[in-house]
């Protein structure tokens, strides 16, 4: 039987039987990509090797089945991987919506950037390595913790986060976002805002050119691990007192001691200077009095004077990513939801 063609890619079945052959058409100018099943002369006397309709249907059915497997619709070997891909897509889409809303909200209230940075820092800095308690768990939302001296002036930043959370929760298909997650994501958006603001300043205040500069030379591609660590759980009560310094009153040694206690150090203290208070220049002036911190302060100041400020941005992202996960076991299935499955038994070929 001749003249049966498959325009889609079909796997080779030449080994399934010793009397079926696939031949490709050729011409004087080119070789066709169309695969054709052709009748050939029998090599064993008395044996008919013609393709029957059932053979063609078998090939077509196999091709459709393999395509369904490739697309994750078969409930067998690839099912777990398909589910994992669906969950990644759902989480990524949800996170993108949060980031867009945070970016828009922060752009309208840039004066809250220092508050958002310190909220992210202080929520995480309650981590105690010895007891493995505290950390980036959203406990700063409790009034008994927010009212502490080290958190003075952060209530407006938390109010902004509450507003965004309320809107995000109203559209979430996978449950409400945790305070732990949205506090750190707000910190991330605040950091990005400072990066973009710096690029705009370097372009003489031209927002369009600043956006182009940040897009071309910025560090957006360095946030991968931070974004993946999405699924923090919330504390059910305030963290213990006395774990976070009053950054505006602490000595450099006290600041170093706290950073070291959570697994960071002088380098991270220097690069995260913007998190310690609203006046980064004044903070860095103080930090530069310490011989261990001073070289790093100078390094990042030089970096911020460059067009791309790569060293500063990349090192800050690295330090912030580590800080944002203190005390957490990330739930990589958070914010996912079941999707409707295709019932293959109802499909007719």
Curated annotation (Swiss-Prot):
Family matches, as SUPFAM superfamilies: Heme-dependent peroxidases
First-level EC class: oxidoreductase
Chain positions with Phosphoserine modification: 155
EC number: 1.-.-.-
A GO term, aspect molecular function: peroxidase activity
GO cellular component, one term: chloroplast thylakoid lumen
GO BP terms, alphabetized: cellular response to oxidative stress
Superkingdom assignment: Eukaryota
Keyword annotations: Chloroplast, Oxidoreductase, Phosphoprotein, Plastid, Thylakoid, Transit peptide
Pfam families with a match to the protein in the record: peroxidase (PF00141)
The keyword Transcription is assigned to this record: no
Places the protein is found: Plastid, Chloroplast thylakoid lumen
PANTHER family (alphabetical): THYLAKOID LUMENAL 29 KDA PROTEIN, CHLOROPLASTIC, THYLAKOID LUMENAL 29 KDA PROTEIN, CHLOROPLASTIC-RELATED
Family that this chain belongs to: Belongs to the peroxidase family.
Protein name: Thylakoid lumenal 29 kDa protein, chloroplastic
Source organism of this protein record: Arabidopsis thaliana
Annotated gene: TL29
